[in-house]
Amino acid sequence: MTTRKRNEFLDLAPSDDEDNDRGYDSEAAEESKARISKRRRTQTQDDESDQSDNDSVASDEDLKLSKSKGKAKKPQQRSEEDVISDNDDEQQETSGTQYLDVTEQETKSSKRKPLDKGKPPKKNKTGVVYLSSLPPYLKPFALKSMLEARSFGPITKVFLSPSVRPASAPRRRSNKRKTYTDGWVEFASKKTAKLCAETLNASIVGGRKGGWYHDDVWNMKYLKGFKWGDLMEQVQRERQEREAKQRIEDARARKEDKVFLQGVETGKVLDGMQRKNEEKKKRKMESGDAGGQQTEELKVRRTFKQNEVKKGRHTIKDGEAALEDDTKRVLGKIF
């Protein structure tokens, strides 16, 4: 092993000021790193060589002892290095076969079935039933369960339009349940929708005798050629119209409020001006500028200039009309 010629622990450590004066040099830093790694590599190689020498000496002693004891023993087995090399070869062969298997699996999975372009797309075979009136306070989930209990299913979609209370109606305080005016129910098949509309139309809801909806009557109609997309378009159109009307009404109300507030502000300004004028007059009267006599408020008298009314032809006399003709002729000669 190599011996250190100098003790690093007893040497003086470089000061920070010196490093700061030198600055940071990337090349110098890389060279120092390479030098340190080379030093570590040489130290590890020396340690390994020492250990190998010791192992070789010990193995020679063991061989001598085994030979002195007797030569009638079995031949020495294969060294561990040979066994390890054989195992490595087997692992390489198995890994090669596995790699081949993986490629085969990938090729099999990559082969996909071509799409059937000849088949037409599936038709929408759903049917829609319209309910013109609904029992009061009937919820969509309850309506769906009622129809499915009578084996009219499966039901895919339900839409109920809520009732809009007029502005003049009294405000409800206690009852918060919603009421619906009409609704649409979509069935998975047209056949079920037609059968439901034919059997339940103009019949009582039924169910439990003391139930809430027992005596109400179904009002159903199958909508031929009507799909759920058409309904959504209609509902969206109605909603947009309702929102547009509401926006127009809101704009009109805002405009009226703005005009009213402007009138109130102008009225306040005029009242303030009148009050100030009265206060000025009072101060003048108190100071004696008016000679101690109270002057009455001067009433404003407005004068208007009225345009002269021209006489029509039916009001003009014959002499005046002839004179006008003469004057016109004379003036025409002069000018």
Swiss-Prot record:
Residues 66-76 have a biased composition (Basic residues). The keyword Kinase does not apply. Gene3D superfamilies: 3.30.70.330. GO terms for molecular function: RNA binding. Residues 1-127, 272-321 are annotated as: Disordered. GO terms for biological process: endonucleolytic cleavage in 5'-ETS of tricistronic rRNA transcript (SSU-rRNA, 5.8S rRNA, LSU-rRNA); endonucleolytic cleavage in ITS1 to separate SSU-rRNA from 5.8S rRNA and LSU-rRNA from tricistronic rRNA transcript (SSU-rRNA, 5.8S rRNA, LSU-rRNA); endonucleolytic cleavage to generate mature 5'-end of SSU-rRNA from (SSU-rRNA, 5.8S rRNA, LSU-rRNA); small-subunit processome assembly. Residues 21-34, 105-119, 296-321 have a biased composition (Basic and acidic residues). InterPro entries: ABT1/Esf2 (IPR039119), ABT1/ESF2_RRM (IPR034353), Nucleotide-bd_a/b_plait_sf (IPR012677), RBD_domain_sf (IPR035979). It is found in: Nucleus, Nucleolus. SUPFAM superfamilies: RNA-binding domain, RBD. GO terms for cellular component: nucleolus. Residues 82-92 have a biased composition (Acidic residues). Residues 127-217 form the RRM domain. Keywords: Nucleus, Ribosome biogenesis, RNA-binding, rRNA processing. Belongs to the ESF2/ABP1 family. PANTHER family: ACTIVATOR OF BASAL TRANSCRIPTION 1. Involved in the small subunit (SSU) processome assembly and function, and in the 18S rRNA synthesis. Required for the early cleavages at sites A0, A1 and A2. This is Pre-rRNA-processing protein esf2. The lineage of its organism: Eukaryota, Fungi, Dikarya, Ascomycota, Pezizomycotina.
